[in-house]
C-alpha cells in the first residue's frame, strides 16, 4: 500500500510527521505493509522546481494508492501570479486525479463541547459527514459570462455526475450510522428535482441505508438548531461549499477537521486548516486534523474501517486528557502525538 506524502508548507511538515508516526505505529503492530515516499508540493515545490505541482510529484501521486497532504501557502509566495501560487497546486492535483467527491467530517469530541459556538447541550453528540460534489454544478457550468449590463452562470448536472457522488455518500453512510440526507432545492430548481430523483434511484442499491431529503435553506437552519440528528449529508458543489463551511465551525476549532477528496484517481487526504506560518517550527501546531486525515485514509483508501475507528478513539482520549494549546491545553505537537500513540 503506497502512500505519497506531500508535507507542503508552514506547519504542514510538522503535522504530517505526526500523522506518519501514528500510521507507522499501527503498521508495526498490524503488519499493514504501508510504504511512503515524500514529494515536493506547494511553496516548497515552487522554491525547488518553479511550480507548485511539478512533474516528479505528479508521477509520484499517480503511482501511489493514497496521498497524505499537509498544507500549502504562506506570505513568501503571496506576490506570485495567481496561477503559480502554492494554492493552485491543490486545484491541479485534484484535477489530475479527477477527484469528484469531497468528504468533510465535523465531530464534536466528548468533553470538548465547550469549544463549540453552540450551547453544549446542542453540540453534544455532533458527528456529521458532508459529502460535496466537487467538479460539476454552477462553478463549472457553461455558458457563463458577464457584460456591463448583466452576468450569467449555468447550474448543470449530468446523471453520471450525481450517481457517482451519491454512491460515495451511500457507501460512507453504510460504514457509519446508515442514514443519508440529500440536500437540494427541488422546490425551485429543475437541477434540484433531477438531483433528488437520481439520488432516489441510487438508493435502490442501498436498502440498508435510510434516505431523507432537505431543502438547502432548511438544512442550514437544522445544522445550527439540531446538528446531532445528521449522519451523512450529500449535496452539490455550491451547496456543499456553503454547508461544509457552516458545519466546520461546530467543533470549535479548524485544528480538529480532516478531509478527503475521492474520485477516479489517487485519493487525497488533508487537514482543513491552513499552513499557519506564524507558528511553523515552534512545535505547538495541533496535529489532530492531520492524524484524523490519516484515519480517513485508512478507511476510504484501504478499507481498514476498524483501524480508522481506533485512531479516532485514541485522538478523542488524548484531546480530553491532554489538549494542545489551541484548545486551552499545553501539549505541543510531539507531546500530543505521544499521547495519541499511548492511547492507541
UniProtKB/Swiss-Prot annotation:
Where substrate is bound, by residue? Answer: 94, 104, 132, 217
Cofactor(s) for this UniProt protein:
Mg(2+); Mn(2+)
Chain residues that bind Mg(2+): 217, 241, 245
One of the record's GO molecular function terms:
NAD binding
- Entries under Pfam families matching the protein: Iso_dh (PF00180)
Explain the purpose of this protein: Catalyzes the oxidation of 3-carboxy-2-hydroxy-4-methylpentanoate (3-isopropylmalate) to 3-carboxy-4-methyl-2-oxopentanoate. The product decarboxylates to 4-methyl-2 oxopentanoate.
The protein, known as? 3-isopropylmalate dehydrogenase
Q: What species is given as this protein's source? A: Thermus aquaticus
Gene that encodes it = leuB
Amino acid at each position: 500500500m503506497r502512500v505519497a506524502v506531500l508535507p507542503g508548507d508552514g506547519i504542514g511538515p510538522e503535522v504530517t510527521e505526526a500523522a506518519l508516526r501514528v500510521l507507522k505505529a499501527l503498521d508495526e503492530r498490524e503488519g499493514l505493509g504501508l510504504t511512503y515516499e515524500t514529494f515536493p508540493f506547494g511553496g516548497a515545490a515552487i522554491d525547488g522546481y518553479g511550480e507548485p505541482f511539478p512533474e516528479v510529484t505528479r508521477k509520484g501521486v499517480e503511482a501511489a494508492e493514497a496521498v497524505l497532504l499537509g498544507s500549502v501557502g504562506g506570505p513568501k509566495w503571496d506576490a506570485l501570479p495567481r496561477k503559480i501560487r502554492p494554492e493552485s497546486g491543490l486545484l491541479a492535483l485534484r484535477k489530475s486525479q479527477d477527484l469528484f467527491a469531497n468528504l468533510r467530517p465535523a465531530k464534536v469530541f466528548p468533553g470538548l463541547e465547550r469549544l463549540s459556538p453552540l450551547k453544549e447541550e446542542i453540540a453534544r453528540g455532533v458527528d456529521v459527514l458532508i459529502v460535496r460534489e466537487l467538479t460539476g454544478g454552477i462553478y463549472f457550468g457553461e455558458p457563463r459570462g458577464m457584460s456591463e449590463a448583466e452576468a450569467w452562470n449555468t447550474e448543470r448536472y449530468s446523471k453520471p455526475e450525481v450517481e457517482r457522488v451519491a454512491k460515495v455518500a451511500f457507501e460512507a453512510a453504510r460504514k457509519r450510522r446508515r442514514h443519508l440526507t440529500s440536500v437540494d432545492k427541488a422546490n425551485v430548481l429543475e437541477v434540484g428535482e433531477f438531483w433528488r430523483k437520481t439520488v432516489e434511484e441510487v438508493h435502490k442499491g442501498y436498502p440498508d441505508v435510510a434516505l431523507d431529503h432537505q431543502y438547502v435553506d432548511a438544512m442550514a437552519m437544522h445544522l445550527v438548531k439540531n446538528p446531532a440528528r445528521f449522519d451523512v449529508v450529500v449535496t452539490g458543489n455550491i451547496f456543499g461549499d456553503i454547508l461544509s463551511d457552516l458545519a466546520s465551525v461546530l467543533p470549535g476549532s479548524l485544528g480538529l477537521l480532516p478531509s478527503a477528496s475521492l474520485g477516479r484517481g489517487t485519493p487525497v487526504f488533508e487537514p482543513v486548516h491552513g499552513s499557519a506560518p506564524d507558528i511553523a517550527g515552534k512545535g505547538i501546531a495541533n496535529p489532530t486534523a492531520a492524524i484524523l486525515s490519516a484515519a480517513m485514509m485508512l478507511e476510504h483508501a484501504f478499507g481498514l474501517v476498524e483501524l480508522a475507528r481506533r485512531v479516532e478513539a485514541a485522538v478523542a482520549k488524548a484531546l480530553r486528557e491532554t489538549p494542545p494549546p489551541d484548545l486551552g491545553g499545553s501539549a505541543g505537537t510531539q507531546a500530543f502525538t505521544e499521547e495519541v500513540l499511548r492511547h492507541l
